[in-house]
């Protein structure tokens, strides 16, 4: 998915607003995903997936860091997330659909916290960005 100049501006703008809360939002998105799509818990058998657990917060921090890095290097998402793509494809073998589910949950969290900032245009740009991240993370699956 190709991000236009306007999309890139919108994504950078929304990430500037959420930057101070990225870890919190990452954990909220994971919590929402585990609640809404309980089948996603199968990839975390060693986690306490209860609301607010330290493990959800810790993994949410990793998710947020990856998204922030991708937004900061929006012109090279593939290069930025290459190692993470290798990890998910070759070692963790996460079902690719889960990236889409997590992206949807992240969008909801952003909408909850920044409803005025998530205009239809920004929503579309953020959705395209999250789809691009998901595509990169699944590119090395065979």
UniProtKB/Swiss-Prot annotation:
Tissue: Red blood cells.
Residues holding heme b: 88
Cellular component, GO, one term: haptoglobin-hemoglobin complex
Domain Globin: 2-142
UniProt KW rRNA processing keyword: no
Keywords for the protein's UniProt record, in alphabetical order: Heme, Iron, Metal-binding, Oxygen transport, Transport
Role played: Involved in oxygen transport from the lung to the various peripheral tissues.
Subunit composition and interactions: Heterotetramer of two alpha chains and two beta chains.
Family to which this protein belongs: Belongs to the globin family.
Note: This alpha-A chain is from the major component, which has been called the Q-II component.
Protein's UniProt name: Hemoglobin subunit alpha-A
Species: Coturnix japonica
């Amino acid at each position: 998915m190709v991000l236009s100049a306007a999309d890139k501006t919108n994504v950078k703008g929304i990430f500037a607003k959420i930057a101070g809360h990225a870890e919190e939002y990452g954990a909220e998105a994971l919590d929402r995903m585990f609640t809404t799509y309980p089948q996603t818990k199968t990839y975390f058998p060693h986690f306490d997936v209860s609301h607010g657990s330290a493990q959800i917060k810790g993994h949410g921090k990793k998710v947020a860091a990856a998204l922030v890095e991708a937004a900061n290097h929006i012109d090279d998402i593939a290069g930025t997330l290459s190692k993470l793509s290798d990890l998910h494809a070759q070692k963790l073998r996460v079902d690719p659909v889960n990236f889409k589910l997590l992206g949807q949950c992240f969008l909801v969290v952003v909408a909850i916290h920044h409803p005025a900032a998530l205009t239809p245009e920004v929503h579309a740009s953020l959705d395209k960005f999250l789809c691009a991240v998901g595509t990169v993370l699944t590119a090395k699956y065979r």
